[in-house]
Amino acid sequence: MSYANLEQTIEAAWEERAGISTATTGAVREAVDEALNLLDSGKARVAEKAGDAWQVNQWLKKAVLLSFRLNDMVPIEGGPGSSAWWDKVPSKFSGWGETEFRAAGFRAVPGCFVRRGSYIAPGAVLMPSFINLGAHVGEGTMVDTWVTIGSCAQVGKNCHISGGAGIAGVLEPLQANPVIIEDNCFIGARAEVAEGVIVGEGSVLSMGVYIGASTRIIDRTTGETFYGRVPPYSVVVSGTTPGKPLPDGTPGPGLYCAVIVKRVDAGTRAKTGINELLRT
């Protein structure tokens, strides 16, 4: 089925989604399964760059959501003490052996959870972490311990997502755009990027930086303020903006913001560059 036919079938099914269930067969189920296979293999992405802008393929998000109506809950083996989990989305690695892992070309350390419908590019390293369906992780990227990469989030190549960081998902609300981390970015430990924020290529977010759609991102050098995007090659730390005076004239509480303290330079690259030894 061509992409155009897939999109048409899924869009039509979405309009009639109330009537779709685990009993549904035929073209709708086949289209959703094919869409998930395209996402899983990396042949399609929920978001892709067209020139300087990112384009979101909403129909692929709809396919992911429709799969929850089509697929029933089943036991998933591999729980602690020979127990099982109970879910609708199988592991990406279900049925895999040495042949499949070698062909995929990435490392999956014990304790990482990757749901089917997500794509992991060759050379990536997955420490114990969680990667949700629809997500895309680029070539050579390190996903460190306790990282969460949410549904449909897009992470570029040669990135380092540090321990405990969160890259938020975007299955609801439906029209929301996914979080995008462009190539060669460093996301510090326990940082969080959410609500469709785009982190531009080569940027560095310090430990504990939180950025959502309404977070003020202030360039300390120019005074310029950004919302929803970090310009390429920015070094970002947490900060505060002065609060407005309270009614009695006393200083009001300051508000959180993210501060661009400089642009990436050789010193920054030396501290945050990827270690090729870990990717072999």
UniProtKB/Swiss-Prot annotation:
Location, primary (coarse class): cytoplasm
Gene Ontology annotations for the cellular component aspect, listed alphabetically: cytoplasm
Pfam families xrefs: Hexapep_2, THDPS_N_2
GO MF term set: 2,3,4,5-tetrahydropyridine-2,6-dicarboxylate N-succinyltransferase activity; nucleotidyltransferase activity
Gene3D superfamilies, A to Z: Hexapeptide repeat proteins, Tetrahydrodipicolinate-N-succinyltransferase, N-terminal domain
Pathways per UniProt: Amino-acid biosynthesis; L-lysine biosynthesis via DAP pathway; LL-2,6-diaminopimelate from (S)-tetrahydrodipicolinate (succinylase route): step 1/3
First and last residue of the signal peptide: none
Keywords: Acyltransferase, Amino-acid biosynthesis, Cytoplasm, Diaminopimelate biosynthesis, Lysine biosynthesis, Repeat, Transferase
Protein name per UniProt: 2,3,4,5-tetrahydropyridine-2,6-dicarboxylate N-succinyltransferase
Enzyme Commission number, as recorded: 2.3.1.117
InterPro entries per UniProt: DapD_Trfase_Hexpep_rpt_fam, Hexapep, THP_succinylTrfase_dom1, THP_succinylTrfase_N_sf, Trimer_LpxA-like_sf
Subcellular compartments: Cytoplasm
Catalytic activity: (S)-2,3,4,5-tetrahydrodipicolinate + succinyl-CoA + H2O = (S)-2-succinylamino-6-oxoheptanedioate + CoA
S-S pairs: none
Organism: Methylorubrum populi (strain ATCC BAA-705 / NCIMB 13946 / BJ001)
Stated family: Belongs to the transferase hexapeptide repeat family.
GO biological process, one term: lysine biosynthetic process via diaminopimelate
